[in-house]
């Protein structure tokens, strides 16, 4: 296995232009495929998850043209359902942002299609989405294990009243919302349990609106969507920078700034993970906002105790930032860390202990007490891009850190370690 040892960083300073958001990129690609007209997507993320979606569009005979650097994509929309040939098998890696929305989208047709992925994808639950799609008439079979991919989809979703459990993943609701306008009947979606990651639903609703479709949202409990609608291409769509990816650079500035300015997101961003900057501010950093940037300056950091259900991906960065804060930090209401690319609660607790932290891992929370001195460790990354990027922050101590399988950042940010190095100053 490859490894990368990061030497201690004495100071972080400069400007970073963010790659496009994974969440926005894959939603925009699918809506562009549904839409009437050609859509030019700019600042598209080039990463593994996006490539899986693009490969799926190719297999589904949706024409698109990609720029040489893969950040501009012109998609010729289908003016409705995307069906694909019967007997097609789509391999979607470990890309939840492709698997869940495509599962719903392909239920609108009547062809038989198999959706599968990497071994970890087969451990990520999809039963709540399948249950909801079946309530709307969809015919779906589990090929291996009940409630998990791979799926055998036979179409049949026609809308109606459906109930979906919102407590595990907001992607299930996102998938239903994006497919529902193309169903033959109106759809009424009722949410069971507490809806996690609400800001990701706001991203979905905002994107649908950009493509000409509105949804009645009754306090995130009931959603009403008219059937037989048509998505309309906005012509051009700029994908904002990835706010989750911004978290590492902002946290680095809070710990060892200098000042870091992150461009591509700003005070009016769609993404809930921009609220990560507010958490850093509560911990003691100085934050400044612009229309298309956020800036962080070093402060004396103190631990916090906070519900971070709304920003689950960026909350991981707080767990490693806690190593540099005074007092303990508790991150609460994050059960859905357990059903991401790996069991992130267990992974973060295990690796934080390696560098010397005292950690309590609960069912849906993590408590971190920083060590007096951070220890050098080899960090297992569990093929999880965010674990790798979170633990790069350990290099902001006086101790090196070794990241195993650093290439796993290709899922969302292939160039991450180079970008971090550009902002880093080292004591010689």
UniProtKB/Swiss-Prot annotation:
InterPro entries: Enolpyruvate_Tfrase_dom, Enolpyruvate_Tfrase_sf, EPSP_synthase, EPSP_synthase_CS, RNA3'P_cycl/enolpyr_Trfase_a/b. One of its GO terms (cellular component) is cytoplasm. GO terms for biological process: amino acid biosynthetic process; aromatic amino acid family biosynthetic process; chorismate biosynthetic process. Its EC number is 2.5.1.19. Pathway: Metabolic intermediate biosynthesis; chorismate biosynthesis; chorismate from D-erythrose 4-phosphate and phosphoenolpyruvate: step 6/7. It is found in: Cytoplasm. Keywords: Amino-acid biosynthesis, Aromatic amino acid biosynthesis, Cytoplasm, Transferase. The active site is at 313 (proton acceptor). PROSITE patterns: EPSP_SYNTHASE_1 (PS00104), EPSP_SYNTHASE_2 (PS00885). It catalyses: 3-phosphoshikimate + phosphoenolpyruvate = 5-O-(1-carboxyvinyl)-3-phosphoshikimate + phosphate. Phosphoenolpyruvate binds at residues 22, 96, 124, 171, 344, 386, 411. It comes from the Bacteria. 3-phosphoshikimate binds at residues 22-23, 27, 169-171, 197, 313, 336, 340. GO terms for molecular function: 3-phosphoshikimate 1-carboxyvinyltransferase activity. Its main location: cytoplasm. Belongs to the EPSP synthase family. Monomer. Catalyzes the transfer of the enolpyruvyl moiety of phosphoenolpyruvate (PEP) to the 5-hydroxyl of shikimate-3-phosphate (S3P) to produce enolpyruvyl shikimate-3-phosphate and inorganic phosphate. This is 3-phosphoshikimate 1-carboxyvinyltransferase. The lineage of its organism: Bacteria, Pseudomonadati, Pseudomonadota, Gammaproteobacteria, Enterobacterales. The gene is aroA.
């Amino acid at each position: 296995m490859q490894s990368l040892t990061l030497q201690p960083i004495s100071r972080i300073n400069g400007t970073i232009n963010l790659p496009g958001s994974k969440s926005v990129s894959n939603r925009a690609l699918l809506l562009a495929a549904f839409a009437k007209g050609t859509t030019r997507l700019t600042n598209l993320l080039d990463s593994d998850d996006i490539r899986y979606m693009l490969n799926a569009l190719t297999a589904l005979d949706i024409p698109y043209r990609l720029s040489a650097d893969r950040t501009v994509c012109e998609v010729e929309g289908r003016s409705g359902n995307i069906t694909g040939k019967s007997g097609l098998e789509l391999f979607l890696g470990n890309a939840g942002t492709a698997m869940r929305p495509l599962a719903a989208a392909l239920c609108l047709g009547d062809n038989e299609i198999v959706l599968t992925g990497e071994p970890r994808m087969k451990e990520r639950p999809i039963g709540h989405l399948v249950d909801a799609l079946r309530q709307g008439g969809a015919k779906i079979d589990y090929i291996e294990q009940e409630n998990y991919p791979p799926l055998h989809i036979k179409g049949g979703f026609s809308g109606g009243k459906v109930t979906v459990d919102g407590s595990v993943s907001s992607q299930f609701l996102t998938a239903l919302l994006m497919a529902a306008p193309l169903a033959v009947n109106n759809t009424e979606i009722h949410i069971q349990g507490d809806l996690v990651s609400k800001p990701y639903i706001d991203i979905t609703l905002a994107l649908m609106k950009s493509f000409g479709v509105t949804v009645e949202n009754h306090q995130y409990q009931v959603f009403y969507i008219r059937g037989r609608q048509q998505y309309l291409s906005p012509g051009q769509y700029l994908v904002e920078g990835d706010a989750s990816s911004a978290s590492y650079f902002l946290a680095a500035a809070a710990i060892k700034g200098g000042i870091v300015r992150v461009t591509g997101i700003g005070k009016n961003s769609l993404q809930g993970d921009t609220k990560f900057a507010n958490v850093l501010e509560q911990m003691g950093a100085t934050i400044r906002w612009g229309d298309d940037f956020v800036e962080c300056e070093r402060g004396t950091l103190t631990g916090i105790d906070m519900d971070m259900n709304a920003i689950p991906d960026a909350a991981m960065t707080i767990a490693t930032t806690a190593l540099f804060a005074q007092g303990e930090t508790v991150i609460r209401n994050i059960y859905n860390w357990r059903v991401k690319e790996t069991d992130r609660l267990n992974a973060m607790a295990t690796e934080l202990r390696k560098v010397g932290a005292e950690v309590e891992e609960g069912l849906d929370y993590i408590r971190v007490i920083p060590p007096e001195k951070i220890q050098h460790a080899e960090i297992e990354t569990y093929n999880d891009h965010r674990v790798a990027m979170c633990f790069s922050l350990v290099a902001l101590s006086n101790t090196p850190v070794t990241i195993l399988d650093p290439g796993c950042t290709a899922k969302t940010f292939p160039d991450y370690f180079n970008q971090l190095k550009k902002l880093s100053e080292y004591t010689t």
